[in-house]
Amino acid sequence: MLEQQRNSADALTVSVLNAQSQVTSKPLRDSVKQALRNYLAQLDGQDVNDLYELVLAEVEHPMLDMIMQYTRGNQTRAANMLGINRGTLRKKLKKYGMG
């Protein structure tokens, strides 16, 4: 089961346009790292207090949106796919104005 999850995680890729105008795929985590690098560079040494929540919201909201579309709004199925209980899913959907 863990091996299956790892293989599934490898499927989380992003298509990007490289310098030679070719579309390539790279792991989602690499795109997140690059976005964080860019964000931190823009801070120019200043501190920020809510980075965890900011990043979580940027990933969590679209993930919830897509999983709810995929499950056709079935919260029980969505919660199972996400590995969280349905009550937690409902709280998260409410947080983002989705439920």
Swiss-Prot record:
Residues 75-94 bind DNA. GO terms for molecular function: DNA-binding transcription factor activity; sequence-specific DNA binding. Keywords: Activator, DNA-binding, Transcription, Transcription regulation. Gene3D superfamilies: Homeodomain-like. The keyword Signal does not apply. SUPFAM superfamilies: Homeodomain-like. Pfam families: HTH_8. It comes from the Bacteria. Activates ribosomal RNA transcription. Plays a direct role in upstream activation of rRNA promoters. Belongs to the transcriptional regulatory Fis family. NCBIfam families: PRK00430.1. This is DNA-binding protein Fis. It comes from Haemophilus influenzae (strain ATCC 51907 / DSM 11121 / KW20 / Rd). The lineage of its organism: Bacteria, Pseudomonadati, Pseudomonadota, Gammaproteobacteria, Pasteurellales.
